[in-house]
């Protein structure tokens, strides 16, 4: 139930406050995080309450499809903002950017899609979770979505998601591994065979789209720039035999670890660096930032909170395990959380028992 998830969250919030008090340092973002969790939990309850009223009953699968389709809408907005500057101006006239967000978008405005916020690693993580959820959800039939639409959504999420953040590739890889495990367990289930057909159709459509773009639209500077950025790793794999990108090569230099036992245990209670454009100790690697923030004790509490949340949401063990593996993988690049996307799903238990996954 959500009560178990809330108890795990309380353990994490106490560690955050303890680290701040013991270090005598109250970083604005860091020390206010317990309040942020409380706000997310409250907003999640309100969202599910409204959906339950609007739909006359809400279930787990319908919420996840809403999350997926919301991401599709977010990506459509990304495309519009990239090719139509007036849309970009209207959006940012309504929603004000921080200095860090504005600087990041200015540096990458010609070679990647972007929308509200920096939307790079965070967006890639969200799209990855949605790709994995699509594969999980596609094992069932729905009245409100046709089976042939699913591979189109999957391909669209991956292609446009890669143009926003190449982290989206991680979601596709984990989703394919999950699909392989399902095939082994199903032993020839017709539903799974149909799912495999969908995936192969989606992969073929992506390959065909990439080929047509490369042949007929390479004279378009903007599209060529987007494609080169989105699929840099794949291009390098074919050309040099190594799946590397410019960002992945720099990433290993950002692995910086504490040099004292105090920081290893409870952290330094600091997230931001010397200015608003940098992180503490000049590292944005998830595991490093977690340890510098609140040490190994806080990191374990943080991971435990996400684990308990997934166990509340999913019933089938393989489903929450594969999402948890994807979550852990993201920490090798940046900090990713599950509470924003999965807390509303946990709130479903307060209204009715969700469909078993």
Regions found by a protein language model. Name each.
Residues 92, 225-294:
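Long extracytoplasmic/lumenal interhelical loops at the membrane interface
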Residues 6-222, 278-357:
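Hydrophobic transmembrane helix bundles of membrane-integrated enzymes that assemble
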């Amino acid at each position: 139930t959500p009560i178990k998830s809330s108890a795990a969250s309380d353990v994490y919030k106490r560690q955050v406050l303890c680290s701040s008090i013991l270090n005598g340092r109250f970083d604005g973002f860091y020390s206010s995080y317990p309040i942020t969790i409380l706000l997310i939990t409250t907003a999640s309850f309100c969202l599910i309450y409204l959906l339950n009223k609007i739909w006359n009953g809400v279930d787990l699968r319908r919420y996840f499809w809403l999350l997926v389709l919301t991401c599709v809408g977010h990506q459509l907005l990304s495309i519009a903002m990239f090719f139509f500057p007036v849309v970009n101006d209207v959006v940012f006239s309504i929603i004000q950017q921080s200095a860090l967000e504005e600087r990041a978008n200015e540096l990458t405005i010609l070679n990647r899609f972007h929308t509200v916020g920096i939307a790079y690693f965070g967006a890639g993580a969200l799209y990855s979770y949605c790709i994995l959820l699509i594969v999980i959800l596609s094992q069932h039939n729905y009245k409100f979505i046709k089976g042939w639409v699913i591979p189109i959504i999957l391909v669209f999420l991956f292609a446009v998601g890669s143009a926003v953040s190449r982290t989206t590739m991680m979601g596709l890889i984990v989703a394919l591994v999950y699909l392989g495990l399902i095939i082994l367990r199903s032993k020839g289930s017709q539903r799974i065979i149909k799912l495999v057909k969908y995936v192969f159709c989606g992969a073929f459509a992506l390959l065909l789209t990439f080929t047509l773009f490369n042949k007929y639209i390479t004279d378009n500077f903007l599209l060529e720039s987007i494609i080169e950025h989105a699929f840099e790793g794949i291009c390098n794999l074919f050309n040099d035999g190594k799946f590397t990108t410019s960002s992945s090569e720099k990433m290993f230099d950002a692995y910086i670890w504490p040099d004292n036992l105090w920081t290893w245990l409870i952290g330094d209670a600091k997230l931001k660096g010397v200015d608003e454009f940098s992180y503490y100790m000049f590292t944005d690697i998830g595991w490093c930032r977690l340890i510098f923030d609140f040490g190994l004790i806080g990191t374990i509490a943080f991971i435990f909170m996400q684990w308990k949340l997934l166990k509340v949401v999913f019933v089938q063990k393989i489903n929450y395990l594969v999402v948890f593996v994807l979550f852990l993988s993201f920490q090798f690049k940046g900090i990713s959380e599950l509470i924003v996307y999965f807390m509303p799903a946990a709130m479903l238990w307060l209204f009715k028992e969700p469909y078993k996954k």
